[in-house]
Each structure stands twice: as structure tokens, then as C-alpha cells.
A protein has these predicted regions:
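Short acidic/polar capping segments at secondary-structure boundaries
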Residues: 2-8, 29, 56
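A short, acidic, flexible beta-alpha connecting loop/helix-capping segment that sits on the rim
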Residues: 5, 70, 162-168
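Surface loops at the rim/top face of extracytoplasmic beta-rich domains
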Residues: 7-19
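Outer-membrane beta-barrel and related beta-rich outer-membrane complex signature
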Residues: 10-12, 96-98, 136
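Residues that define the transmembrane beta-barrel architecture of outer-membrane proteins
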Residues: 16-20, 65-69, 102-108, 139-143, ...
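Outer-membrane beta-barrel "beta-signal"
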Residues: 19-31, 147-151, 156, 170-174
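Detector for outer-membrane/organellar transmembrane beta-barrel domains
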Residues: 23-132
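Outer membrane beta-barrel transmembrane domains
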Residues: 113, 117-163
Length: 174
């Protein structure tokens, strides 16, 4: 069902102002659990390949019409979890803002986790994003390390993480 109570029409595209999104995945070894590791499922062998896209259509607000496409991968093999995603995003301003430019961005991440003990998982992640658009310099890169401890019998997980935020291609560095 669609909530039509407050739906407006886009001034630019003359269609309902909504987030239109879709995702297509291929899981050749059965359904991939939506977990980044689970101590109760340490004998899994799953893999996922995906493609996603979305268009966010704004109405008369002084905002943007955004388009995003992405590729994803995830794998769960016994004690090991791996995942990666890459995406492209285009931000186009609405006519009301009187800005004729649009901006394109690239980003992505890779992450992994490994159970070193029955309830203790070590994890690492690396994010990258060109926050000034593909036409200008200015990348953020954020490496992170962490650990997850899963308590027995209560569906509770304790997480600890250290993340460093760095940038390059800017006039000043962090």
C-alpha cells in the first residue's frame, strides 16, 4: 500500500515525490542470513551478489533529486564473514534552487569478521568516500578495527570499535 495522505508531486519531474528503490540479489548457496556473523551459525557456507538502485524524487522543497546505484558482495564461510559494497550517487538540484550543477560521488567499503573464540569475533572495516564529488579532490577514508562479544542465551552483543577518520586531497589534513 502507498501512503497518499501527504504525497506531493515533483515540480521538476511531475511524478509522485517518493523514494523509488530496488535491490536484486543472487544467492547461489541458499538464503544469506542478514547477520555479520553469529556464534550459533559457525558452519554456514553462503554467498551473495547484489545490485541496488534508488531515485529520491523531491517535490517543491528546496532540495535535490538523487540517484544512487550500487554493487554488493557478502560471504559467510564457517567462522569468516566478508562483505563489500561500491556505489555511485548523483545529486541534482531542483529547478527551484536555480542551480544548474549536479554532483557525482563514489564510495564503498570492505569489511570482515572472524570468530577467534566461540563467542568473540574480531572485525575490520575500511570505508572510502569522495565527499566533494568526482570533479574535486577530497576523499575521506576511514579504517576501523573492532571486536564483538556475543552473550550466551540472551541475544545481546557487546561491540567495541576504533575508527580513524582521515582525508586526502584537501587544503588541510586532519
Amino acid at each position: 500500500s502507498v501512503n497518499t495522505a501527504s504525497k506531493t508531486m515533483s515540480d521538476d519531474w511531475h511524478i509522485p515525490s517518493l523514494l523509488y528503490a530496488g535491490r536484486l540479489t543472487y544467492m547461489p548457496k541458499g538464503v544469506m542470513p542478514s547477520t555479520q556473523g553469529n556464534p550459533n551459525r559457525l558452519n554456514e557456507d553462503k554467498i551473495l551478489f547484489g545490485l541496488s538502485g534508488s531515485i529520491n524524487v523531491e517535490s517543491e522543497n528546496e532540495s535535490t533529486n538523487d540517484t544512487r546505484v550500487g554493487l554488493e558482495f557478502a560471504m559467510l564461510k564457517n567462522k569468516l564473514y566478508l562483505a563489500a559494497e561500491a556505489y555511485y550517487m548523483n545529486v541534482g538540484f531542483t529547478k527551484r534552487q536555480k542551480i544548474n550543477e549536479s554532483y557525482s560521488f563514489l564510495g564503498g567499503y570492505v569489511q570482515g569478521g572472524y570468530f577467534v573464540a566461540p563467542r568473540l569475533q574480531l572485525a575490520a572495516r575500511y570505508d572510502i568516500f569522495n565527499r566533494n564529488g568526482t570533479d574535486d579532490d577530497g576523499f575521506l577514508n576511514m579504517p576501523a578495527v573492532g571486536m564483538n562479544y556475543f552473550f550466551r542465551g540472551c541475544n545481546l552483543k557487546l561491540q567495541a570499535m576504533y575508527q580513524y577518520v582521515a582525508r586526502w586531497g584537501h587544503d588541510t589534513q586532519l
